[in-house]
Amino acid sequence: MKKINFVFSLLMLFCAAYTSAQSNYKIINKFHIDGNGGWDYITMDESTSRLYISHGNELNVFDVATNKLVGTIPDTKGVHGISLAKDLNKGFISNGRDTSVTIIDLKTLKTIVKVKVTGNNPDAILYEPYSQKVFTFNGRSSNSTVIDAKTNKVIGTIKLSGKPEFPVSDLKGKIFVNIEDENSISVINVNTLKVEHTWPVAPGESPSGLAIDRINHRLFSVCENKMMVVVDYLTGKVITTLKIGGGVDGVSFDPELKRVYSSNGEGTMTVVQQKNANTYTVLENVPTQKGARTIAVNTITHRLYLPAAEYNDAPAVTAENPHPRASVKLGTFTVLEVGLK
């Protein structure tokens, strides 16, 4: 009997190892959206099944329950992203090319007002519900503009040590933001509007996307050198690092599944399993599409959304242009829906 149990145990271990080697995720849908231009951040509102997609000079609003485009917010030049203030029925859109924030009514999708920011190229944007303030992170001026979300007025500017990337909030008075060119994370006090700490993410380099686990007090910072850095946000200590795909610009955390997803522009999505606060393992690298570098997760359906498009062949290398970039094929903008098989 012991021999049979031993053989059975070995068989189960083999099956488990075989299963873990298989891809558990796949592309379920591809949503084509008309229009041309680049893209950046994407935001999911689970309560309405609406996906807010930055796209060129407009913001697309897509219903993932009906698979239909439900609205477009125009005149958002160089749009980077949107942050939702559900308690105020407002959305705040960062417009990089005209240094402004467009404030919209979330029910009607109509513009309420456009506010000029105090920096250059507002990129990532965050509504912080604890303070009811909005923070734009201005990439070319290394600062953050602070807006009172109730009055729609600029109330302050925060100087940062370098180029800010994506921010997250602990919902208790602290904002964490990647500082790309300093290889660090800065901690902002939302009451004093001061930087309290700056923590290195070494060996991570050029951090971009950032996600948060508020239960275990962890930050997930994804970096250009194909690395995810896990940081204790109570102490700033680097807990561990994991290998991810290349060209990353976004990361999402699903607290129910305890999984972290990095969207890699090379055309993969790295899936990381959290075993406990300090232990993580890479489950797989799911094929997506070249250029799918930002991501949002629906924490109810556990599906992931990644914008992408097809590319033309890159032009030949010349002395004047030693690093030519491939252009996007017109009319190919798509949002990938990725889910469990």
Q: Model-found features: residue ranges?
A:
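Bacterial N-terminal signal peptides that target proteins for export
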Residues: 1-8
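Predominantly soluble domains enriched in secretory-pathway, periplasmic, or organellar proteins
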Residues: 12, 18-341
